[in-house]
Structure formats: structure tokens, C-alpha cells
């Protein structure tokens, strides 16, 4: 089923079909932003679904359904992160302290460390590198961010270098 939906009587059916086609993508985005914490992933998924419903009528078909969902979901996660950052939880404070005190031998899961490092990047760079890691092309990322493909390529290269340096620093 293609967007945009002009027949409002089928809106709910089309929306549910879109969710079914893309539930793995939505879960993946929420999982990355929630650092894999199951309860937080569920909360994030609910927020993303609400946002997708809210903006469902605005999709104009200039990008793929997958690209549009990624952009709405990522923007929702960034909004939640900004909201959460105003009031850090005890868990966030403890996690930050643990990360700073870890040695290379204490890190069991390099993917978890990478997720934490990505979550510390500036919002747009974090979104771009996540989209790249999720397999989106430079063209698709450019559509999501309103940047040129060249700018996307440059940001990805710089962000990879920055993450490499941060990762190596944490592993020492």
C-alpha cells in the first residue's frame, strides 16, 4: 500500500498495514535510543506510534515510506532525549559514572559502549550515523536531514573518526 493516503475512510487500515511492514525498523530505532532497556523501548515505541499517527496525513510521498518513518521516529526520540536530559534519572547518573570508570577488560559488550558513545554525539550527527549503521543510503539520509549527499558523506566520515577516537579512549 502506497502513501499518501487520501481516502480518510481507509486511514486506520493503511496505518496499521504500514506499522506491520515497518515494526522491526521502529523497534530497532527505539532500541538504539533506549540503549536496549526493554521497558524504555516499549515506552519509546508507543511515543513513535503516536507521532507516526499524528503526522500520517502529512506524508507526501517525496521519499520512501521507510525513510519517512525513520525521520519521524528519530525526531521523536530526539525530542524524548531532550525532555529526559532536563531531569536525569538515578540510572543515567550511575551509568555515566560506570562508563567513565570502566577499563577495557571491564567492557563485556562493545556494541553497548558504541551505543552509549553514539548517544553522546550531537543530535543530528547521532541520527546520521544511526541511519548509516541501519543501512540507509547517503541519498536516503540526505532526504531525512535536508542535507546534500556530499554533506552526509562528510559527516559520516567525521563521525566515524570521532567514534573511533572515543572508543579507543574508553578502551584504554
Question: Model features per residue range: what roles?
Answer:
Residues 8-17, 27-47, 58, 144, ...:
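Short, charged helix-capping/linker segments at alpha-helix termini
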Residues 58-60, 71-91, 107:
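Arg/Lys-rich amphipathic alpha helix in sigma70-family domain 2
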Residues 48, 72, 128-129, 141-142, ...:
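Hydrophobic positions on the alpha-helical face of helix-turn-helix-like DNA-binding modules
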Residues 43-50, 54, 63-75:
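Structural recognition of an alpha-helix C-terminal capping motif at a helix-to-coil junction
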Residues 23, 27, 49, 126, ...:
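C-terminal flanking helix
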Residues 98-130, 134-146:
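Amphipathic alpha-helical segment used for protein-protein interaction
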Residues 18, 22, 26, 30, ...:
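Residue-level preference for hydrophobic side chains embedded in well-ordered alpha helices
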Residues 78, 145-170:
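DNA-recognition helix of helix-turn-helix
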Amino acid at each position: 500500500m502506497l502513501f499518501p493516503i487520501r481516502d480518510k475512510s481507509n486511514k486506520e487500515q493503511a496505518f496499521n498495514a504500514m506499522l506491520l511492514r515497518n515494526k522491526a525498523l521502529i523497534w530497532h530505532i527505539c532500541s538504539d535510543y533506549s540503549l536496549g532497556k526493554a521497558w524504555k523501548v516499549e515506552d519509546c515505541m508507543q511515543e513513535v506510534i503516536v507521532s507516526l499517527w499524528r503526522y500520517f496525513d502529512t506524508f507526501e510521498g517525496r521519499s520512501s515510506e521507510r525513510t519517512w518513518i525513520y525521520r519521524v521516529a528519530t525526531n521523536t526520540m530526539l525530542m524524548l532525549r531532550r525532555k529526559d536530559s532536563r531531569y536525569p534519572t538515578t540510572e543515567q547518573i550511575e551509568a555515566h559514572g560506570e562508563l567513565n570508570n570502566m577499563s577495557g577488560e571491564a567492557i563485556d559488550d562493545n556494541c553497548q559502549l558504541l551505543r552509549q558513545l553514539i548517544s553522546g554525539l550531537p543530535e543530528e550527527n547521532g541520527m546520521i550515523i544511526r541511519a548509516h549503521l541501519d543501512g540507509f543510503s547517503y541519498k536516503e539520509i540526505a532526504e531525512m536531514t535536508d542535507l546534500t549527499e556530499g554533506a552526509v558523506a562528510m559527516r559520516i566520515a567525521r563521525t566515524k573518526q570521532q567514534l573511533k577516537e572515543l572508543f579507543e579512549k574508553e578502551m584504554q
